[in-house]
């Protein structure tokens, strides 16, 4: 711990940590070797100054090293958000995940229960009859057999229990809100990550580049959504061929109609489960349109689609053919069957 105090002093002076220093600090915190005061001081010092790319890379590398991993096919994708956008939207990325899987791209979905919203990915999946408490080996089998699997964050990141109480006591956003979406237990190399603030677009794309991602989009809607929105434009930082570039997209680009922000709002887990099921069963409207736009982007990132419009067309076909709904049914059945294999 002799090295930790000097790092605290560095942060207190407003000086950035290098990648190795950040990794050391987060290893000590996640191993339970720091006091709550030390942990809180470091987290708030980083938050006030603003976390750097190297600090996030160092922290994520530790989180990934400590996680319980899952095997997934090469080419698997994840569609995930940081949360914290206060939008109250329905579970867009979860719905999009079934659409992507229905289009033939394996999905290794990583998520949690609601932290700042009424319904997180885990909550809505449980309401849809999906068991979220599978052991890593069972999830690997689930993805292999059905083309989609859900990894419940607390199961795969046991070291987080050492920082959880301090995060709750702080009661404000910290670097850990960024680390979860960047720490997929299946090690996917292609992902779409939604963020709660536009300022994080390019930095998180650079983090993904440093951590070995092949292709990724980091997105933020003009309405504040940590997804691609259809109520306005969406800013994108795209990682492709080792380069990050930024651009803006709109629903009109792919033939979709804008909707009011209220049209994307959801409710509790039961409400959102019914909405998600309705979309997969072919119901028209804003819920469908925002899901197919997000799924279309994921299909582009995966390499299955040649353009965003092509991806949106594939996403629509995934729903209209019944393939997306079939993935939900397959996931529910597979997780129920595999549930007895859960570790005691």
UniProtKB/Swiss-Prot annotation:
GO terms classed as biological process: L-tryptophan biosynthetic process
Q: In which pathway does it act?
A: Amino-acid biosynthesis; L-tryptophan biosynthesis; L-tryptophan from chorismate: step 2/5
Q: Which UniProt keywords apply?
A: Amino-acid biosynthesis, Aromatic amino acid biosynthesis, Glycosyltransferase, Magnesium, Metal-binding, Transferase, Tryptophan biosynthesis
For the keyword Amino-acid biosynthesis, the answer is yes
The reply to whether Glycosyltransferase figures as a keyword in the UniProt entry is: yes
**Complex and partners:** Homodimer.
Its name, as the record gives it, is: Anthranilate phosphoribosyltransferase
State the species of origin. Azorhizobium caulinodans (strain ATCC 43989 / DSM 5975 / JCM 20966 / LMG 6465 / NBRC 14845 / NCIMB 13405 / ORS 571)
Point out the gene that encodes the protein: trpD
């Amino acid at each position: 711990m002799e090295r930790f105090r000097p790092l605290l002093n560095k942060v207190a002076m407003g000086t950035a940590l290098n990648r190795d220093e950040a990794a050391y600090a987060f290893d000590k915190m996640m191993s339970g070797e720091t006091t709550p005061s030390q942990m809180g001081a470091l987290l708030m010092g980083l938050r006030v100054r603003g976390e750097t790319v190297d600090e996030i890379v160092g922290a994520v590398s530790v989180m990934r090293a400590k996680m319980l991993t899952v095997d997934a096919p090469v080419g698997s994708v994840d569609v995930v958000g940081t949360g914290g956008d206060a939008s109250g939207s329905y579970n867009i990325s979860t719905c999009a995940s079934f659409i992507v899987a229905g289009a033939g791209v394996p999905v290794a979905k990583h998520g949690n229960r609601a932290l700042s919203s009424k319904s997180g990915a885990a909550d809505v999946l449980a309401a849809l009859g999906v068991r979220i408490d599978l052991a890593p080996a069972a999830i690997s089998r689930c993805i292999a057999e059905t083309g989609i699997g859900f990894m419940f964050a607390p199961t795969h990141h046991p070291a987080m229990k050492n920082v959880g109480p301090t995060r709750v006591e702080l009661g404000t956003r910290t670097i850990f809100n960024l680390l979860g979406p960047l720490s997929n237990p299946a090690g996917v190399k292609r992902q779409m990550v939604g963020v709660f603030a536009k300022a994080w677009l390019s930095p998180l794309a650079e983090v993904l580049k440093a951590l070995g991602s092949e292709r990724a989009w980091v997105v933020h809607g003009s309405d504040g959504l940590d997804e691609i929105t259809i109520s306005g434009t969406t800013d994108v930082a795209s990682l492709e061929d080792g380069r990050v570039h930024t651009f803006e997209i709109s629903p009109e680009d792919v033939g979709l109609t804008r909707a009011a922000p209220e049209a994307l709002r959801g409710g509790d887990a039961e409400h959102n489960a019914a909405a998600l099921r309705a979309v997969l069963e072919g119901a028209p409207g804003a819920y469908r349109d925002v899901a197919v736009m997000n799924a279309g982007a994921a299909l582009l990132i995966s390499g299955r689609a040649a353009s965003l419009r092509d991806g949106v067309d594939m996403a629509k076909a995934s729903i209209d053919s019944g393939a997306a709904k079939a993935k939900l049914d397959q996931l529910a059945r597979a997780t129920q069957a595999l549930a007895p294999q859960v570790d005691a």
